[in-house]
Regions:
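Active-site Tyr-X1-5-Lys
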Residues: 152-179
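Glycine/proline-rich active-site loop of Rossmann-fold NAD(P)-dependent oxidoreductases
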Residues: 174-176, 188-199, 232-242, 264-266
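Conserved Rossmann-fold NAD(P)-dependent oxidoreductase catalytic core, especially the SDR/UDP-sugar
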Residues: 83, 87, 98-99, 103-155
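Substrate-positioning beta->alpha
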Residues: 111, 196, 213-234, 240
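NAD(P)H-binding glycine-rich loop region in Rossmannoid oxidoreductase-like domains
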Residues: 54-107, 115
């Protein structure tokens, strides 16, 4: 699955991974090592990176997308840039985050591209999001069905703009090669954050979920997304999008499955949308008072409402262009739960 341009006698290609300690990033690092890459892993915290990677043969680069100059020297000698880092909804503490979204997802993207080009990097896989796409309820959405900025929330809008930055760069630099992978709601082992996906599993396992939230998602294993990212190097086309969104799942089906796999009783009641908005409003207030991450942000509640049954995404390019298949949902959740137990999140 590695880049076919690399001969057997050539030194192992050097990969630079942003967001390396995140759910996707750490699974990508492991997949790259398995494919024979040398890996430079960007992390804001060296201690967190050492805990996450536990002695794996990688080079940890300490740095932050808000200060790209602090790690720019580590970009020299890199063959491929994998950009998984972003400011996203799981980072929210309630309130308005437009400034951070623009700074990290859009402006830092442009600076990273410019700096990488100057360092000699000519290949990149950018992790975008299903947020840049939109279709009608129940419709199968493919990579061509773009969401308009004027109908996007701040996070969705920032991902649309980050893609535009990359496409503009590709137009200006014909020698630069890049494509985009669009994940769904990622689950899987290694979710040390945890993300909203992992927190949902933990809440069900701990019996803390008061009811089943409304809505639907497109759920994917982070390891499958990592494989798609690597497959793009040999099978992807310049400037193209590749959905790695997984499968449509209603929360009404997903929550009982998690409960069964964690030996818990599933919540018996469903949370109506009006009540979800009340919970989100109260969570925003609590987050502002405590400065802790919001349990249910207003943006998340709005997204659940607006995106309900808009989680049917095409897997054609994933299957036919990249030659991949999604692993069973139960396997993903079982591995995720087992990892949480091993890591001490669950007994």
């Amino acid at each position: 699955m590695t880049d076919p341009s690399q001969s057997k006698n050539a030194p192992a290609p050097v990969a630079f991974v942003t967001g390396a300690t995140g759910l996707l990033g750490n699974n990508l690092v492991r997949a790259l090592l398995a494919e024979g890459f040398q890996v430079r892993a960007l992390a804001r915290s060296e201690a967190k990176a050492k805990q996450q990677f536990d002695g794996l043969p990688i080079e940890i680069i300490t740095g932050d997308l808000q200060s790209i100059s602090s790690f720019s020297a580590a970009l020299f000698g890199v063959d491929i840039l994998f950009h998984t880092a972003a400011y996203f909804r799981d980072s929210y503490t309630g309130g308005n985050h437009d400034q951070d979204l623009e700074a990290i997802n859009v402006k830092a993207m442009k600076e990273l591209l410019d700096t990488s080009w100057k360092a000699g990097i000519r290949r990149m896989v950018h992790v975008s999001s299903i947020a840049v796409l939109k279709g009608a309820k129940g419709q199968t959405v493919d990579e061509t069905m773009l969401r308009r900025e004027d109908e996007a929330d701040p996070y969705f809008r920032s991902k649309i703009r980050s893609e535009k930055v990359l496409n503009d760069f590709l137009a200006d630099y014909p020698e630069f090669w890049a494509c985009m992978v669009l994940p769904g709601w990622m689950h899987g082992p290694g979710d040390r954050g945890p993300t909203s996906a992992g927190q949902t599993v933990l809440d069900v396992a701990r019996g803390k979920l008061p009811g089943i939230p409304p809505g639907s998602v497109s759920l994917v294993d982070a390891r499958d997304v990592a494989l798609a990212i690597i497959a793009c190097l040999s099978k992807g086309k310049r400037g193209e999008r590749y959905l790695a969104a997984g499968r449509h799942q209603t929360m009404a089906d997903l929550i009982p499955l998690i409960a069964r796999l964690t030996d818990r009783k599933a919540p018996s009641r469903q949370i109506p949308m009006p009540l979800l908005y009340v919970i989100a409003a109260l969570s925003e207030v609590q987050a502002r008072l405590t400065r802790k991450p919001v349990l249910m942000s207003w943006a998340t509640a709005k997204a659940l409402a607006s995106e309900n049954d808009r989680s049917h995404f095409s897997a054609h390019r994933f299957h036919h262009d990249l030659g991949l298949t999604f692993r069973p949902l139960e396997e993903t959740l079982t591995d995720e739960i087992n990892w949480f137990r091993k890591a001490g999140f669950l007994p």
